């Protein structure tokens, strides 16, 4: 509903990711340029058009990023904005525990609302499953939510009701 990139038109298997090496090379060049220009980043953030934790080499990409950050701009933080759908994977969990800001999204306590708002691709997606996986971080995460009212595909969507907010807070 609210992603500036729109709905994901691709389906599993149709995704394309930059290679680990390309990410490292481009990040290194960018960080070197920023440091040379005396404008080092405050934060290196993984987010955007797709889910970063779905990258097949996500753990290694995070390792490379932390190494480059430590070498070139040690004051910068590393952040990941995630829809939390991959946090059940051990490699993703390990990587997210290494970043400074592990930001995981959960927009409702109700599966039906999440399906309308976020259109998760997995038929097995459940809020309960996501919450259980979040508990494994032992508080080492930031919970991100967007409360909104609107319409999607002719269907009302509202996670600002008393019922929604009360359930989310539990």
How would you describe each model-predicted region?
Residues 26-30, 168:
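Short, well-ordered amphipathic alpha-helical segments that serve as non-catalytic structural scaffolds
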Residues 30-39:
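Phosphate/pyrophosphate-binding loops at sites that engage ATP/ADP/AMP, CoA/4′-phosphopantetheine
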Residues 1-22:
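Canonical Radical SAM [4Fe-4S] cluster-binding loop centered on the CxxxCxxC motif
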Residues 22-26, 125-126:
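Glycine-rich anion/phosphate-binding loops
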């Amino acid at each position: 509903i609210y992603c500036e990139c729109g709905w994901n038109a691709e389906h599993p298997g149709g995704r394309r990711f930059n290679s680990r090496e390309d990410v490292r090379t481009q990040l290194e060049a960018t960080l070197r340029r920023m440091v040379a220009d005396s404008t080092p980043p405050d934060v290196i953030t993984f987010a955007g058009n797709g889910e970063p934790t779905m990258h097949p080499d996500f753990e290694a990409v995070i390792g490379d990023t932390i190494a480059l950050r430590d070498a070139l701009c040690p004051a910068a933080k590393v952040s990941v904005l995630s829809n939390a759908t991959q946090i059940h994977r051990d490699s993703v969990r390990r990587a997210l525990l290494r970043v400074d800001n592990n930001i995981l999204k959960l927009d409702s306590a109700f599966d039906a609302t999440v399906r309308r708002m976020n259109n998760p691709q997995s038929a097995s997606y459940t809020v309960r499953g996501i919450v259980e996986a979040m508990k494994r971080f032992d508080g080492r995460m930031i919970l991100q939510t967007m409360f909104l009212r609107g319409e999607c595909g002719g269907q009302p969507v509202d996670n600002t009701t008393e019922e929604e907010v009360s359930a989310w807070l539990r």
